[in-house]
Amino acid sequence: MVLSAISVIILGFLVAYGLLGYLFGFAYTSIIVTGALAFVTFFTIIQWLLGPLMIKAAYRLIEVKADDPTYGWVYNLVQEVATYNNMSMPKVYVAPVNFPNAFAFSSPLFGKNMAITTPLINILNKDEIKAVIGHEIGHLRHRDTEILLAVSLIPTLMYWLGYSLWWGGLLGGGGGGRNSNSGLLFLIGIVLIAVSFVFNIFVLFLNRMREAYADVNSALTIPNGASNLQTALAKIVIYTDPGIVDRVKQKSGGVAKMLLFSGTDVSNEEIPSYKAQELVNYWRTQKVGILSDLFSDHPHPAKRIKLLDKFTQAQWSPVA
């Protein structure tokens, strides 16, 4: 997937370079296309290599070791799940922030990493935490960070190339080109910008696919992973929207989307499983449209629950 994305980027670069060089002159085109490519590639590589540093700073991550008196058991859970997945142990962090979440990130310089926020640790039981870890380990196993970063290069490059051509058209084109048609240059820029936004919808779709794939990884490699991940997802939503269960009972109001966090001051204790199960049962019967999560990077919760239902009776087994 990564190599395919890189191939598409290179091919698109060559096609754009040839077409624009023919229309507007290769000297002018070289400045625009090469400049846009260099700009996007440079900042993407920096983001990939140094991203973990930015994440650690933004979330104030605290590294956890096996002998940690407070969170050593979290380290042990990650180690257990990594063993199930036949994967090397990632670095484990706890994030002292005010919303429940877990996330994995990696780079060639800083290796594989996983972070869990303190509210998530507080509101889930250990089996549910293990299922969430199985989801995040799935992201690391499948190299989702690298795949999504490579694919997202395509619309980013399209946008900046289009933006450069748009300004080139406004400023009068290349001057020495075959046609010196600034209007056509402007039009090509607008089209590329529009296509970049459309392609971003595909990137979101791919992101949702990777999330679903990570859910399946947890279901297949963790004992009772599917059912525990279901209640974990429900508890996260209940934490961010405490009134959702009552609204579901009354059949009024919508369901909160996954990972829409708020600063609501709610109990920082484990959420009762029966409340989570009520929400899971509602999602099982909720009808959601194809476009319900079109602009989201996560599948609608109801879709995730229904997918996990297919694996609740599956025989789990460690990865060979």
UniProtKB/Swiss-Prot annotation:
Q: What does the record give as the active site? A: 136
GO terms, biological process: proteolysis
Tell me where the transmembrane regions lie: 6-26, 31-51, 147-167, 185-205
Q: Which GO terms describe its molecular function?
A: metalloendopeptidase activity; zinc ion binding
Q: Name one GO cellular component term.
A: plasma membrane
On cofactor binding, the record's note says:
Binds 1 zinc ion per subunit.
List residues binding Zn(2+).
135, 139, 211
InterPro entries, alphabetized: HtpX_protease (IPR050083), Pept_M48_protease_HtpX (IPR022919), Peptidase_M48 (IPR001915)
Its subcellular locations are:
Cell membrane
Q: Name one Pfam family in it.
A: Peptidase_M48
Per the record, the domain of life is Archaea
HAMAP family per the UniProt record, alphabetical: Pept_M48_protease_HtpX (MF_00188)
Homology family: Belongs to the peptidase M48B family.
The identity of this protein, by name, is Protease HtpX homolog 2
